[in-house]
A protein has these predicted regions:
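Short, hinge-like loop/turn segments at secondary-structure boundaries
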Residues: 50-54, 105-108, 131-132
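Short hydrophobic/aromatic patches at helix-to-coil boundaries
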Residues: 143-147
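Small/aliphatic-rich secondary-structure junction motif
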Residues: 3-55, 79-88
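Structural beta-alpha unit
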Residues: 75-113
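Short, well-ordered secondary-structure micro-motifs
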Residues: 18, 45-48, 99-102, 125-127
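Glycine-rich, Arg-bearing micro-motifs that act as flexible, cationic patches
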Residues: 112-134
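Short, structured coil segments at secondary-structure junctions
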Residues: 131, 139-140
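A short acidic, glycine-rich active-site loop
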Residues: 55-71
Length: 147
């Protein structure tokens, strides 16, 4: 049914469970997987208009953000490799993670998105996390929500 599944992660425990389930689904379907992380750009209050930021502070933030993004994508990579599922990793900088997830799915030509019900921000919106809700509402391809 699905040949290419995007599995976004934010590094949360719920996302880790979704990664395992998404990889298992991909394996059973003979699909490949793209692991995805939406890296938030430098917060405006650190380098915003009219504010001169310390270059070392900015560099340290960027370094740590990139390391965390790589760690998150590596979690998907490790699970895919262990299951023998073809894998590709993608990181995009975005202030709108839901848009980045949808854009990544389009760019990578995925035919489904397998996403955790909620991430680091908890149970926003009662049942689904706000990012997951926005992906569900705006995606043009099937979205499978793991809870």
């Amino acid at each position: 049914m699905f040949k290419h599944i995007l599995i976004p992660t934010d590094g949360s425990r719920t996302a880790a469970k979704a990664i395992k389930a998404g990889i298992q689904l991909a394996k059973e379907m003979g699909a490949r997987v793209t692991g995805f992380y939406a890296q938030e750009p430098l917060p405006l209050h650190i380098h915003g208009e009219g504010y001169i930021a310390d270059k070392e502070l900015v560099a340290e933030f960027e370094k740590r953000a990139a390391e965390y993004a790589a760690k998150c994508v590596a979690e998907v990579s490790d699970a895919a490799k262990a299951a023998g599922v073809p894998f590709e990793g993608v990181v995009l900088k975005s202030q709108s993670p839901h848009k980045a997830i949808i854009d990544a799915a389009k760019q990578q030509k995925c035919d489904a998105i397998f996403i955790a019900s909620h991430g680091h921000k908890g149970l926003t919106g009662l049942v689904l996390g706000s990012v997951t809700q926005k992906v569900l509402v705006n995606s043009e391809i099937p979205v499978l929500v793991f809870r």
